[in-house]
Design a protein with these regions (language model features):
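N-terminal active-site segment of His-dependent metallophosphoesterases
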Residues: 1-20, 94, 290-308
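Divalent metal-dependent hydrolysis catalytic cores, especially in the metallo-beta-lactamase
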Residues: 2-6, 12-13, 34, 221-222, ...
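Short active-site-proximal "capping" loops at secondary-structure junctions
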Residues: 7-9, 41, 228, 258
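His/Asp/Glu-rich metal-coordinating catalytic cores
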Residues: 9-148, 152-157, 161-165, 170
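Accessory, non-catalytic peripheral segments of nucleic-acid enzymes
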Residues: 173-308
Length: 308
């Protein structure tokens, strides 16, 4: 099992977490775990003062290679000291499938968090196992190999949407095949919903439900409301969230709308509404706050229940 970094979120890791990981490794003594630390974790710190099982192999800031039947797996932790020099002596074993694991963002320069992809081409790498990006992706490296981010096993926020899982590598007769295997028990989805012109929460709710059709009920959904909204519209995020919260495991609703309002329409309006809107538009409040203030004020002027 190749773990290409970021198993932890930081250097400070609870002892209980470390113990559970090491216990899991010990329960499968016939499986080797090859762990390369990422930019969010520190192997030396995390496993300090712990007895490391023999089947947990830790990469360091120097190249190391672990050989198996027909496969050689090499890796190195990128740091300031080796960010440029590591490309000069990339390990390669003749007659076997060569896998290299690194952690960082692929790019065109050599840095602590950036992997210089061009310097890895034509080095006999059949598969470049990468960590850092939490979404699965794969691209050709050169004529002989590919590079691949396996992503994470479970999405941890709405910035990590889509299928999550691991990559299964199969090596037979000197040939490597790879397959993405979905693993997460649920997915996260960000659903944009343009509510321009809608003034009623019931209409907005119907459009949200239509936009989320086909998403399994066990998944998590974040609705992003956008578009221009009339100042008299009674947009109540809490109401909308309650309207759809039973449809999915978790629901969030974000108001990213803007006021569909033309200041010229209220320039000569002598009503209380006109005076109120002019005062708010001329204030130093942010556009987001102006929209919220005007919406709340309109509710108050019309004698409606104020929703915040």
């Amino acid at each position: 099992v190749i773990l290409a970094g970021d198993m932890f979120d930081g250097e400070r890791v609870k002892i209980r977490t470390i113990d559970e990981i090491l216990d899991a490794v010990r329960r499968t003594p016939n499986v080797d775990y090859l762990y390369l630390a990422g930019n969010h974790d520190d192997t030396a710190y995390a496993f300090a003062d712990h007895d490391i099982p023999t089947n947990l192999k830790l990469f360091s800031k120097e190249w190391a290679t672990y050989e198996y039947d027909g496969v050689a797996i090499s890796g190195i932790e990128i740091c300031e000291a080796n960010a440029h020099s590591l490309y000069l002596n990339i390990p390669h074993k003749n007659g076997v499938v060569n896998i290299v694991t690194l952690h960082g963002q692929v790019g065109s320069s050599s840095d602590v968090d950036e992997i210089n992809l061009s310097l890895l081409k034509n080095k006999g790498i059949n598969y470049l196992a990468l960590g850092h990006i939490h979404t699965y992706s794969e691209q050709p490296l050169d004529s002989e190999g590919i590079y691949c981010y396996s992503g994470c096993l479970e999405g941890r926020g709405f910035d990590e949407c889509g299928p999550k899982g691991f990559v299964l590598l199969t090596v037979e007769s000197g040939h490597l095949e790879h397959e993405f295997v979905p693993f997460s028990c649920r997915q996260l989805h960000r659903i944009p919903v343009d509510i321009s012109g809608l003034t009623k929460n019931s209409e907005i709710g119907q459009k949200m439900k239509a936009a989320a059709q086909g998403i399994p009920s066990e998944d998590m959904v974040e609705f992003l409301l956008s578009g221009g909204v009339d100042p008299t519209a009674n947009l109540a995020v809490s109401y909308l969230q309650n309207l759809v919260k039973r449809d999915f495991f978790l629901v969030k609703v974000k108001d990213q709308t803007h006021l569909a309002i033309n200041p010229e329409d209220y320039k000569h309006d002598i009503s209380l509404k006109g005076e109120f809107i002019r005062l708010v538009l001329d204030s130093d409040a942010s556009e987001e706050d102006k929209a919220a203030i005007i919406r709340t004020g309109m509710q108050a002027l019309m004698g409606e229940e104020i929703t915040l």
